[in-house]
């Protein structure tokens, strides 16, 4: 019985692994641009091709509608359910949030019910065509890594074109045509991606798969990216070396999956029958609840991350490259022509780094903190020597230990690094983090570790309170001084003045005029336990 269970679990694991492995393999590599390796000559940099992780690119886009006033609700209007032209009690009103359907609802989270969606005005001006262009712009070159998925809240359109731009919207090329009747709408024979091959993968087709009218289970339109990958990598995308080889050597294939903008052209809404019902035009409109576009910044295999700042995407370039797409060599690193990285050989690829110009070795890039540098052939890089102004690093771009970056100063400012000034009595060491905060000892707080936490007082650093006149009282008439010691009357001694001084001399008795020592108080017992764990105090 146990053997059969083991075999069943093993079979399940093998099945899951075989299914998941290709998808982990597809996008799991090229996430490191360089790494230190050990050779006979010592530690050296190993440069590799690298790219950002695939992500949801709708977070970074700008959407534009044409005509601009095509969204419903201004003025308010009623519309009918597609499946029932007599149910016209739905209302779109742009001035009421609960009834408004603005464009941003195409990109929000769709985990709730009812779903949110953008909606156009109805076809009230029939027979004038009801046509809408929805343009998605990134102001940056991106590479598509998964299917484009458009979910309609209304019926899928009878006619639609998905277009792409590679030059920020100046020119457009069709990606795919969609129609209930391709021959009638676009004079094209209907096809599906399954009809293509390696040799025809770039063919622009018209498909009738996604334009079958309204149905609750038929709301989605795809542009199949992964099916096209599969022509080279196999049905489960196992042979990525083949796909990467094609992307490396075939510019047209690489450009096919690359865009700066996408445009959805809605040419005819879902009618549901051959003829338009002119008595119920309020049932004809477009409504989109979700658009999914997954991809990554195109960085020419010279970066692993892409910054989004001031509504703009920019690659964080490595390999001595620069530009929004890492598309050129940095100044003084033009010793050979710029080249994109290469996916091959699998799995690390080739970095094709930019190397220093022969004339640039004497012109160091040290942000003005040094005029000396050295080209290290083994590391294939230039390193600044003798950085000043408390800086360090390959380009004097970092701060020395015990200093932190001045956020208000440029990298070439002499005051770019500020001393941490950690209090030596309250801090563990003299170093601080990037915000100037020091690492404090127990009981100490503050940016420079010069303040005490409650229950502690400053005395050559923060020490636990001995007395506080609240919980820990000095006894027998003693007075608390600065929370760190009790000043006792002449006849008493001890931390809380709890002992008779005569006890130390062994002279307590009736003759001395001093009685037996008082019984310990709860406060004294508490203090004794605290001090027992905190260690000896110095007075």
Swiss-Prot record:
Protein name, per record: Netrin-G1
Annotated glycosylation sites: 133, 320, 406, 433
Region (NGL discriminant loop II): 208-214
Propeptide: 511-539
A Pfam match: Laminin_N
GO molecular function: cell-cell adhesion mediator activity
UniProt note: domains: The laminin N-terminal domain mediates 1:1 binding to NGL ligand with sub-micromolar affinity. Three NGL-binding loops mediate discrimination for LRRC4C/NGL1 among other NGLs by binding specifically to its LRR repeats. This specificity drives the sorting of a mixed population of molecules into discrete cell surface subdomains.
Topological relation to the membrane, as annotated: Lipid-anchor; GPI-anchor
Processing after translation: N-glycosylated.
Subcellular location: Cell membrane
Lipidated sites in chain (GPI-anchor amidated serine): 510
Leader sequence segment: 1-18
Tissue: Expression is restricted primarily to neurons of the CNS, particularly in the dorsal thalamus, olfactory bulb and inferior colliculus. Isoform 1A and isoform 1D are the major products in adult brain.
